Amino acid sequence: MVQKYQSPVRVYKYPFELIMAAYERRFPTCPLIPMFVGSDTVNEFKSEDGAIHVIERRCKLDVDAPRLLKKIAGVDYVYFVQKNSLNSRERTLHIEAYNETFSNRVIINEHCCYTVHPENEDWTCFEQSASLDIKSFFGFESTVEKIAMKQYTSNIKKGKEIIEYYLRQLEEEGITFVPRWSPPSITTSSETSSSSSKKQAASMAVVIPEAALKEGLSGDALSSPSAPEPVVGTPDDKLDADYIKRYLGDLTPLQESCLIRLRQWLQETHKGKIPKDEHILRFLRARDFNIDKAREIMCQSLTWRKQHQVDYILETWTPPQVLQDYYAGGWHHHDKDGRPLYVLRLGQMDTKGLVRALGEEALLRYVLSINEEGLRRCEENTKVFGRPISSWTCLVDLEGLNMRHLWRPGVKALLRIIEVVEANYPETLGRLLILRAPRVFPVLWTLVSPFIDDNTRRKFLIYAGNDYQGPGGLLDYIDKEIIPDFLSGECMCEVPEGGLVPKSLYRTAEELENEDLKLWTETIYQSASVFKGAPHEILIQIVDASSVITWDFDVCKGDIVFNIYHSKRSPQPPKKDSLGAHSITSPGGNNVQLIDKVWQLGRDYSMVESPLICKEGESVQGSHVTRWPGFYILQWKFHSMPACAASSLPRVDDVLASLQVSSHKCKVMYYTEVIGSEDFRGSMTSLESSHSGFSQLSAATTSSSQSHSSSMISR
């Protein structure tokens, strides 16, 4: 398996030329990198004007590997070839490196780049990417992979320290300014200004106190005090190391790489409508930074959010008065770590009464609104406390818990709520404090614990009786000033006290069922299943030419081909496919065919858009300006891989998928809308669907389009 690494953008608050002067001091050897034994220049080229300088070195490394492995391999040192291409005119340095030793067994490629910061020409950006592919290594492939990744990540951590070390060294030598490259023709005319600049730089070096030099200045301390400090931004919306540390926390190099790679994949497939970085990080943490697993559950969650309009729940849904009066839970300040604190007096809550009065779906929706509010409060606290806060603390008081709370429908509703929250809000619970647990609690815990993720379970702290008042209790996690009054604290807690829900508020099963349907059908999106040989099609009748058909769909599972057809004939009434084996008529499995099998393309109907292949996880928005009235058919068709793939060997994942029946099933979630010609005034912005479901978890929204003669399709 190929291991990949992608670094965030590292920002040095120094001019490019000064960074280059520091970088060159790493050769031919670097005492700060013990494994870097030495290097020899193999080839060197300089342009006549001095703007281009290309140098190729052969580097000798002493890899920290087991002695037995070195003996088996028959080598003591590993050799790499490094090619540095400096363009002083463009102020860029590109570094390419690959292994020379065991190149037929192990393939290592690295690319680094130094460029000028896009918002401050006196700052320098650094990026790094690498790949490792071990073909074979005497049966020690796994061991070599671990050693290589360990060595590489340790050197990544030292990279910034090394540059700053040589910057301090230059400072101690009085070198604080390196002039920019200029064409030879104007060098003579600018000698005077250049010399004055050097004098000014020398005077700047004198200003720095000698004591400060002895103590050693950090990179930030050495930056010019007069230099402007805009918000650190990077080209193409890339993440920089300072931003990650400030808003996301301390991550290892491999964790940073996973975040950046998953983020890049989302940008490619969702075209800017991606979740915020902290939300992506939550899914990665929930799957131990396994990119494939995190991507799978994140795509499922994004589809779920879009289908049920969860992004707008705080603005569009008001909790019923019964919840406001009898749901004994609410937000209450924050804990010692700055996490928002949610208090739930479960023992005082009439779970049976709430379920009978509201139904399971209303309770679920209320819990979702609590989680959405928690995400918002985490963002606010991150700004207030100046450090990353991505989770909240929940305090559950169980005083009053009894067998009434073990009512079977109530427990069933609780288990479903846990399942939905675990799937869509991973790593949002920082700590759960369970206080005054009664004897009946172990029974409830036995029912609930199997549905709780192991990582979440480790965050639970359970106190029986008044144990929470002793050592290791509540005071270790919450300041004394904000402990609620019902726990013998000094702070008034405005959480409702709960109590029994009056039976007059109970509703019949039919009323609750209708209410549940109403809650979860409040979505503009529809779901459909697509099978091999059984596409899903919808019919749109256009009366006036020049109308605009818009669409917005997500490919939830599998790969599909999207087509648009026009016909003057009316298709037969829509009929569900009768392939019972696929359970097409089940909820979320709608499948309809409209094009009769006897119809011929070009005679009975025509294609008005080029087929668009859409991969799993992609979000597609687009529109088509109709040329003729009649019947338009939007079709989602199963996409089969060509028999002769580009690669000689198929991927293992593809082989395994082909063995499963479900591999011939795709799922899409779509919304369509028709804009009348009188409402369309020729503006391209009018082509965008007004109901396109953009997630509020998104950090940015951009678009890219693929235009045809009369349509615009954007992914």
UniProtKB/Swiss-Prot annotation:
GO terms for molecular function: protein sequestering activity; RIG-I binding. It comes from Homo sapiens. InterPro entries: CRAL-TRIO_dom, CRAL-TRIO_dom_sf, CRAL/TRIO_N_dom, CRAL/TRIO_N_dom_sf, GOLD_dom, GOLD_dom_sf, PRELI/MSF1_dom, SEC14/CRAL-TRIO_domain. One of its GO terms (biological process) is choline transport. Residues 319-495 form the CRAL-TRIO domain. Ubiquitous. It comes from the Eukaryota. Interacts with RIGI (via tandem CARD domain); the interaction is direct. Interacts (via GOLD domain) with SLC18A3; the interaction is direct. Interacts with SLC5A7 (via GOLD domain); the interaction is direct. This is SEC14-like protein 1. Residues 521-674 form the GOLD domain. The keyword Transmembrane does not apply. GO terms for cellular component: cytoplasm; cytosol; Golgi apparatus; nucleoplasm. Keywords: Cytoplasm, Golgi apparatus, Immunity, Innate immunity, Phosphoprotein, Signal transduction inhibitor. Residues 1-510 are annotated as: Required for interaction and inhibitory function toward RIGI. It is found in: Cytoplasm; Golgi apparatus. The modification Phosphoserine is found at S586. The modification Phosphothreonine is found at T234.
